[in-house]
Amino acid sequence: MATPVRTRFAPSPTGLLHVGGVRTALFSWLYARHNGGRFVLRIEDTDETREHPEAIEQIQRSLRWVGLEWDEGPGAGGDFGPYIQSERRERHREVAEQFLAQGLAYRCYCTPEELAAEREAAQRENRPFIYSRRCLALSAEERAAREAAGESSVIRLRTPDEGACVVDDLVRGQVRFEYGQLGDHVIVRSDGVPTYNFANPIDDADMHITHVIRGEDLLSSTPRQVLVYQGLGAPVPSFAHLPLLFGPDRKRLSKRHGATSVEELREAGYLAEAVVN
């Protein structure tokens, strides 16, 4: 029996919903409807410094205005909630501890100054910055001593030493990412907040998302997220990275091109049918 199609739209509540976001939501909604699947709305509020409390309501209002009703999510409920990412924080911590116990991740105690020195060295040597893994080599006793001293730490995901992640993108075709060029990225910040590339795939896996449809600016995040799916032992969804929207000057659509949010288009008198056509 085929796995039911489940897509999602996962905006961040950092402002008004951009027309590019609605375009992404439209593709996800259409794919779910075409395949008799379910369309999920999830709010990804991991960046607390950029969030606007009223943005969640504005996002929902904009989606409803253009006719994109969600089957699961805020206001609709569902079997795999909560659908607000910050309300799933305990689940993210649970997975982080699981990854630490399995050796898939490790604590890094490097200071901002030490990391800056590594970046400067990479720049002088004309090579991309990749974290040196100095904290990966710490013994259990050294880690315990640092913890006892109250040293701040982040959690990094351990990337395989060799090989590559090959993504069969539904839009771009096969894309290859060499593990040696990725580095061990941070999955939990020093304040305990999970990063986007950690929380996002955990939530997708828990919500049984089968198809991730999003902008091509997130393509480079994919190999890091695939490692999280693999660490969870969860199926890796199919990915489709859409071309971004550009203005007449061939630059990414922004305020300088005029109204770019759904709210602004609605207030300017545009019909919802014109926006999604």
Name each model feature, range by range:
Residues H257, S261-N277:
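A conserved active-site cap/scaffold subdomain adjacent to cofactor or substrate pockets
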Residues A76-D79, M207, A259:
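Short glycine-enriched loop/turn motifs at secondary-structure junctions
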Residues P13, V19, W65, A101, ...:
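Short glycine/serine/threonine-biased micro-segments
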Residues E97-L100, L253-A259:
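Short, surface-exposed amphipathic charged segments that create phosphate/polyanion-binding patches used
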